[in-house]
Amino acid sequence: MDYGFSRKTVVILAITVIAGLVVYNVAPTQIEPGQYQLTLEIHSESIYTSQTYNVSFVSEVADDSIEYRLNGTSTNVTVTITQSVEITPDNPLQITLEAFGDDLSANEIVATLTDNESFNLTLRPNRQSGQTFIIEYQPLVNSQSAVMILTVVAILWFSEGISLVATSLLIPILIVLTDIRSPQTALAPFFDPAVALIFGGFLIGRALTKYELDKRLALLILSRGEGSGSSLILTVMGVTAFLSMWISNTASAAIMIPIALAVISRIRSVDVRDKYGKALVLGVAYSATLGGVASLVGSPPNPLAATYINSFLGVQFSFMSWIPFGLPVVLIMLPLIWRWLIFRFKLPKGIEEMNELKEISYKEYLKLGPMPTEQKLVVVIFISTIALWFTEKLPDFIAHAIGWSGHGISSAVVALIGGLSLMILRLLDEKDVSSGISWSSLLILGSGIALGGAMIDTGLSSFIALQMSGLGIFPSFLVVIIIGCIAVLVTMVASNTGAAVILIPIAIPLATGLGIDPLLIVMVIAIAVSMDFALPTGTPPSTIAYSTGKVEMREMVTTGLIVDLIAILVVTIIVVWLWGFFGLVVL
């Protein structure tokens, strides 16, 4: 084993240190203590008013609030303002408006904070519950340290000068050393509900692969399938995507690639075998990556997004809540990718040898034998876990019909119950836990939540969002497309979790400032960061597909770039319209 640093690592670390020092010195400093003017405007048919209040930002301990009442023709509003704000992390200026009478909407409320000199800031409601609107502004605090940490982490994540795990461990260390958060607060995200959910999902996925239930399911479906040639690719892609909803995309690709290779080997024509091999192998890779966006446990950015939605948007976002957002993406993109692969590699409509796949799959299925007791127990736990995930919080129309809104146990706790059950029944042992869990993914996810929290606590995310406020000159639908493109581009040079960590904390204040539904922007980013299909190094399924030797680098890049384009159009236009049509987001 080689110890020490390679020349590349030394260069990257040197660049990282220099960049960190430079941005620390040029980064915006924290807000100056003093008195500011807050102008609150409400423009609606039932109340039209503009009021100015004094607000102080101070260095010493302070927590003074005052309440005002604004009267309109048919709407009255009670306003509570924090008039004296201590300049510390996670201590925002808060304005609460409670309306009585005719309904107000968030876009009818705007606040302006100014010092009558160079500081001028426009604020809009961050959260809404019924007719209660909350405007929060976290002023810049420890901003130079926050910018330095973000720069260092971004360089190390993008360049992989040190391992992603090492960078993940560096994040809480820097957060504590720069006095942004206490050790308890900085380390708490490493077992955040999002991390616990993925951890429990990994345990269940490990049980499925250990007892070959995933392989059994895949062979069972393929042995019952019909069709040949190009239609068979769609079947294989559908099975792969379904598996990827519940187990890691790496595991689903690892299961389906050997099946695909066995199918390819049956084709006698060299030319047809070559074209079919490229399409089938890429189809497996793409669907393994795509399937992860369909469920909350399918990909780490999903629970990360849910964490921010629950914490900062005041929305109870459950496992069931994710399905109508993620599943349509898969259902729309899967056939589009399939048609593109057929066109790209000019596949014949039917291939005689593919009629044998049903027989091949059935023979392989029979080799597995009858289900032993262990497999049956895993199936029971798996189905029970899914049932509990779906019934955490039922849709309102179902809840009203049956008189039960759901059991209310969080998805993370349900996942842990499922994992614990597997260990109590000795279906999993310590070796399974140590070898079957992607600990690096959990560390990256936990550190990402810690970094995002630091960006929000120091006001950095709001500051960056304000610098992007120029996007307001564009229509909202175009802003959504731009943000989707940015997410896809960032994930081409960083992991999907890293991309989500950087973009989502910025997206919430950006959307609020532009008058766009923050839930819409968060969901677009969470899904778009999992849409990297162009590079072999982009996702593990792409790496596995490339390692088969069936597809060349040039072919993978050119084919994948079109899939990336399809993904951007589907996620930012078609699916967003569906979300709005069914009332999931406000367009």
Language-model features and meaning:
Residues 93-99:
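A short, solvent-exposed beta-strand micro-motif common in secreted/extracellular proteins
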Residues 227-235, 268-282, 316-324, 515-520, ...:
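Membrane-interface alpha-helices at helix entry/exit sites of multi-pass transporters
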Residues 174-178, 306-314, 510, 550-553:
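Interfacial segments of multi-pass membrane proteins
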Residues 1-59, 71, 76, 118-197, ...:
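Hydrophobic transmembrane alpha-helices of multi-pass small-molecule transporters
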Residues 202, 242-257, 275-319, 333-342, ...:
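Alpha-helical transmembrane segments and, especially, the helix-loop junctions at the ends
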Residues 209-213, 255-262, 341-352, 537-538:
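Membrane-water interface of transmembrane alpha-helices
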Residues 269-271, 327, 446-451, 455, ...:
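C-terminal transmembrane helix pair
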Residues 152, 165-166, 170-274, 434-514:
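Membrane-embedded alpha-helical segments and adjacent helix-loop junctions characteristic
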